[in-house]
Amino acid sequence: MRRIVQNNWSKLVAVALVLNLSITSCSFYEEDLKPSVSGEGVIKTESREVEAFSEIELETNATVYVTEGAETKVQVSAFGNLQPFVQTIVNGKTLIIDNKRSFRSEDQITIYITVPSVEKLTVRGAGKVISQGVLGTDHLALKVTGSGEIKVAADAETIKSDVDGSGTIEVAGHAYSQEVNISGSGKLLSYELLTEASQVQIGGSGNAFAQVAKKLDVKITGSGEVKYKGQPTVDTNITGTGRVSQLI
């Protein structure tokens, strides 16, 4: 009798687990099936109340303009019916910009951010982050995952740029040193960034363009290419058909 009860109890537990997993899966599935939202009405600009932050992470198809200023401000410009679906949440020291529902590509969302100091900018997907004016900071990190774009002017001690995918990072201004990592077919455009030393690493078919005064270290695995301005000493480590060339 005890064995029968135990077997029945085991079966009940198994059934409960299956039902729970089914309900959870259905919830996620229903969320994924929600249709995209189309912009309607007029464009509205809404100010968002947020906590202090020094890093920005864009996870949706939007264009973000970043300006350094004394006060922290976040303004979202979009069709009125899309405003509730645009999320601006601060997690730690990072402002995360995302959407609760997918939008049509033509319903472009524009976000204007003013912040005292910027330490890191990240784009995941196809969005864009553009600086208005020069970003002044000791260390600036830039990262694109996907086909997105970051375009900034900066005055920094060090700048670290990472591209994973087919995205583009474009940097102008001044930095003592620059570190670049490209994985895939992405691009780093830093012709207008004056650096003393730059370190570039490419895995894949990516391209990097740099202006270096003293020291350039290059490592390429694949068919990537590095072009540079200036008269630095150059150390190369190439596996594959990659190339390094000087622009006159």
What are these model-derived regions, one by one?
Residues M1-I248:
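Intrinsically disordered, low-complexity terminal regions
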